[in-house]
């Protein structure tokens, strides 16, 4: 059943919903050099340090993202399609060394051997082998897109940790285990060999003991369902990977033939929060994509006539809670944090009111210049932090129209409807100054100490450009204030918080970010900021071309 957006004028008095107004940007600089193929730098390069890196900051910042966008005459169409390039910034007693390597995935090796695109990616359909005859090329179109031999293992999105080992992942069945010292692939792991899922997100969550949780999906005789996955924290045998993984809950898709696309989920101490949003995957289009000569991305569409639903799962029992929470249509790619208070789950998200972002990230759009680039940017949805409240214990006797949230510190509301559902209106966690920064994405917190707990700060990238924006931002979610770092002509990556030894303060440490530029006469660098005042402590300059990447992690020595 498709639930259409209702109007609740009588409830809006207590929960003002301000509409963001954005200025039109003009004269955006071309960033095409940040989205072109680069050479790997497998031998360590000593960086030139300006300022200083704290002596206690010892370890490696690992990042990944696309770094090769063509093979022979074949070119990728979408930013997400590029071959995974692994980056390592190694810090030791104030010195910094950089290296990079292309992930030797089966996809990378197959494409390299044929010097063409052999395996399809998110936005690029691999063409039939020109060496085959006409009949063979025709029949090759009838291979199912999920067939293991034809599915990409180009895991270019994030580093994740299971049982103490690190894996590169995307959103398919496959992960690639890597040696974090050498950046070499050591093993390919298929989720479907352990549990009945067709993939998992690149953003798992972790309990303090190392137990990992993730979201996957599967399609069976009863339709499409979303799966909550749990992976134990420790190995029984040394050679294990994700052995012991379990599906602890299945959530039926609201619309069987068109489930939601999702990139992440929320977690508190006791609950998993899954957001079913109206960014839909048309299963028929995806299943027939190769026959129709279309890429996987052709099967994803924004359907704003549908609302966004919140599903809450008890981590201990695996039970889906009976509460039915929904809101106006929005899209979220990254959750900020979630916690419990006074019988409610509070979840903070980076939200967009338009779900066409995936279309914007076609490489032909990102590489534009002049008015064409301005038009693409001005038409793109901007992402802003919002808070939602989900009351867990809803009385059947609660009157229709009551706001069930008991929380005095947030204007987010949860209003009971006549049919027992709960309409959730958000609180904006920002003022107008964040609109001037183009919104925010790639949110990060002091995860080890504050994930699943009430918190004060998060860090992210401002988006006054299509790729990476031009700033790093510290957001105070209590006072709704910002601290901003910016340098003209440079584009910082996702900020990574590293705590100082012995600290329990949310901002008691430093922020690391890889900052790159399209200007050939300038060096890219690793930036270190004081997380409290957001002032620069130092930078480590590397005379190597780097593309803009996605996610990463810091691993202390």
Curated annotation (Swiss-Prot):
Fe cation binds at residues 203, 263, 334, 551. Keywords: Dioxygenase, Iron, Lipid metabolism, Metal-binding, Mitochondrion, Oxidoreductase. GO terms for molecular function: 9,10 (9', 10')-carotenoid-cleaving dioxygenase activity; beta,beta-carotene-9',10'-cleaving oxygenase activity; beta-carotene 15,15'-dioxygenase activity; metal ion binding. GO terms for biological process: carotene catabolic process; lutein catabolic process; lycopene catabolic process; retinal metabolic process; xanthophyll catabolic process; zeaxanthin catabolic process. It is found in: Mitochondrion. It catalyses: all-trans-beta-carotene + O2 = beta-ionone + all-trans-10'-apo-beta-carotenal; 5-cis-lycopene + O2 = 5-cis-10'-apo-lycopenal + (3E,5E)-6,10-dimethylundeca-3,5,9-trien-2-one; 13-cis-lycopene + O2 = 13-cis-10'-apo-lycopenal + (3E,5E)-6,10-dimethylundeca-3,5,9-trien-2-one; lutein + O2 = (3R,6R)-hydroxy-alpha-ionone + (3R)-3-hydroxy-10'-apo-beta-carotenal. Signal peptide: none annotated. Its main location: mitochondrion. The keyword rRNA-binding does not apply. InterPro entries: Carotenoid_Oase. GO terms for cellular component: mitochondrion. Its EC number is 1.13.11.-, 1.13.11.71. It is an enzyme of class 1 (oxidoreductase). Broad specificity mitochondrial dioxygenase that mediates the asymmetric oxidative cleavage of carotenoids. Cleaves carotenes (pure hydrocarbon carotenoids) such as all-trans-beta-carotene and lycopene as well as xanthophylls (oxygenated carotenoids) such as zeaxanthin, lutein and beta-cryptoxanthin at both the 9,10 and the 9',10' carbon-carbon double bond. Through its function in carotenoids metabolism regulates oxidative stress and the production of important signaling molecules. This is Carotenoid-cleaving dioxygenase, mitochondrial. The lineage of its organism: Eukaryota, Metazoa, Chordata, Craniata, Vertebrata.
């Amino acid at each position: 059943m498709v639930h259409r957006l209702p109007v609740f004028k009588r409830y809006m008095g207590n929960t003002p919903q301000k509409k963001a107004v954005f200025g039109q940007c003009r004269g955006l600089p071309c960033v095409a050099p940040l989205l072109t193929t680069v050479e790997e730098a497998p031998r360590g390069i000593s960086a030139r340090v300006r300022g200083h890196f704290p002596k206690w900051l010892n370890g490696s910042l690992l990042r990944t993202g696309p770094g090769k966008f063509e093979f022979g005459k074949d070119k990728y169409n979408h930013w997400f399609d590029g071959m995974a390039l692994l980056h390592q910034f190694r810090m030791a007693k104030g010195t910094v060394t950089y290296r990079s390597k292309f992930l030797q995935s089966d996809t990378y090796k197959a494409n390299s051997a044929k010097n063409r695109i052999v395996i399809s990616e998110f936005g690029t359909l691999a063409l039939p082998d020109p060496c085959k005859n006409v009949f063979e090329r025709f029949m090759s179109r009838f291979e199912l897109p999920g067939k293991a031999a034809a599915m990409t293992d180009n895991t270019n999105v994030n580093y994740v940790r299971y049982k103490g080992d690190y894996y590169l992942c995307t959103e398919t069945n496959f992960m690639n285990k890597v040696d974090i010292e050498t950046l070499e692939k050591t093993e390919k792991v298929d989720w479907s060999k352990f549990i009945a899922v067709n993939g998992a997100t690149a953003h798992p969550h972790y309990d303090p003991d190392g137990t990992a949780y993730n979201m996957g999906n599967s399609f069976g005789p009863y339709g499409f369902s979303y799966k909550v996955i749990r992976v134990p924290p420790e190995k029984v045998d040394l050679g294990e990977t994700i052995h012991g993984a379990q599906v602890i809950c299945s959530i039926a898709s609201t619309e069987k033939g068109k489930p939601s696309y999702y990139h992440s989920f929320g977690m508190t101490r006791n609950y998993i929060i899954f957001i079913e949003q109206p960014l839909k995957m048309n299963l028929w289009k995806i299943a027939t994509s190769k026959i129709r000569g279309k890429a996987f991305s052709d099967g994803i569409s924004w359907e704003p006539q549908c609302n966004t639903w919140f599903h809450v799962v008890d981590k201990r029992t695996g039970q889906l809670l009976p509460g039915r929470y929904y809101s106006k249509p929005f899209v979220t790619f990254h959750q900020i944090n979630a916690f419990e208070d006074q019988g409610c789950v509070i979840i903070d998200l980076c939200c967009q009111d338009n779900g066409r972002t995936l279309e914007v990230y076609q490489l032909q759009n990102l590489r534009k210049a002049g008015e064409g680039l301005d038009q693409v940017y001005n038409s793109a949805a901007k992402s802003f932090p919002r808070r939602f409240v989900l009351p867990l214990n809803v009385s059947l006797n609660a009157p229709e129209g009551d706001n069930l949230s008991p929380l005095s510190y947030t204007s987010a509301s949860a209003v009971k409807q006549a049919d027992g559902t709960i309409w959730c209106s958000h609180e904006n966690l920002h003022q107008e100054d964040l609109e001037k920064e183009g919104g925010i994405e790639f949110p990060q917190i002091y995860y080890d100490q504050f994930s699943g707990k009430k918190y004060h700060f998060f860090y992210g990238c401002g988006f006054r450009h299509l790729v990476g924006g031009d700033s790093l931002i510290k957001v105070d979610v209590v006072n709704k204030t910002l601290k901003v770092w910016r340098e003209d002509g440079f584009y910082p990556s996702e900020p990574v918080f590293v705590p100082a030894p012995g600290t329990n303060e949310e901002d008691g440490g430093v922020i690391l970010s890889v900052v790159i530029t399209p200007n050939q006469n300038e060096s890219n660098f690793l930036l270190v900021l004081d997380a409290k005042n957001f002032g620069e402590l130092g930078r480590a300059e590397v005379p190597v071309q780097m593309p803009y990447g996605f996610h990463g992690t810091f691993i202390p020595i």
